[in-house]
Curated annotation (Swiss-Prot):
GO molecular function (one): nucleotide binding
Keywords for the protein's UniProt record, in alphabetical order: Nucleotide-binding
Pfam families, alphabetized: DUF520
Gene3D superfamilies in alphabetical order: 3.30.70.860, YajQ-like, domain 2 (3.30.70.990)
Protein's name in the database: Nucleotide-binding protein Sde_0533
Reported function: Nucleotide-binding protein.
InterPro entries: DUF520, UPF0234-like_C, UPF0234_N, YajQ-like_sf
Keyword Glycosyltransferase annotated: no
Domain of life: Bacteria
Family label: Belongs to the YajQ family.
A GO CC term assigned to this protein in UniProt: cytosol
Keyword field contains Nucleotide-binding: yes
Residue ranges of the TM segments: none
Length: 160
């Protein structure tokens, strides 16, 4: 029986490149001259530091633009609320890897509500879809792509 897995992954190398490009753009932008602003990359998250809340918003826009240019979906980021300490502001941007249980349940419910004849199973941080016909699986792919589930999805292990 044909099957495939629905996963949500972010290419860490592309994200790191986007953060480095954003750091480079910060050093060349006129509105950030003489301002203490920086991006700090850690595994699966980036910390933005600036002197003002408005500048954090601009930095987030720069980061989103660089992510899009590197082929990373901007829906794959979660931003925390800006934190003010002393004269600097900081904000943590986390990158979503894997499908959380609540999102996986929404995916399963959306597929089952569509009445497409497939079996759906949650397996850790991925969702396995199995069906009798390849066309049914392609319908499920289209359904998941068009669904507004707050997270980008990729399809792997397509077996015929």
């Amino acid at each position: 029986m044909p099957s495939f897995d629905i996963v949500s992954e972010v290419d860490e190398q592309e994200v790191r490149n986007a953060v480095e490009n954003a750091t480079r753009e910060l050093s060349t932008r006129f509105d950030f001259r003489g301002v203490d602003a920086s991006f700090e990359w850690k595994t699966d998250q980036t910390t933005m530091r600036a002197e003002g809340d408005f500048q954090l918003g601009q930095m987030l826009d720069i980061l989103r633009n660089k992510l899009v240019k590197r082929g990373v979906d901007p829906e794959s980021i979660d931003t925390s609320t800006p934190v003010h300490s002393g004269k600097s502001w900081s904000q943590v941007v986390t990158f979503k890897n894997g499908i959380e249980a609540s999102v996986a349940k929404k995916v399963v419910k959306a597929i089952k509500d569509s009445k497409i004849k497939v079996q759906v199973a949650i397996q850790g941080e991925e969702v396995r879809v199995t069906g009798k016909k390849r066309d049914d699986l392609q319908e499920v792919m289209a359904l998941v792509r068009n669904g507004e589930l707050g997270q980008p999805f990729q399809f792997k292990n397509f077996r015929d």
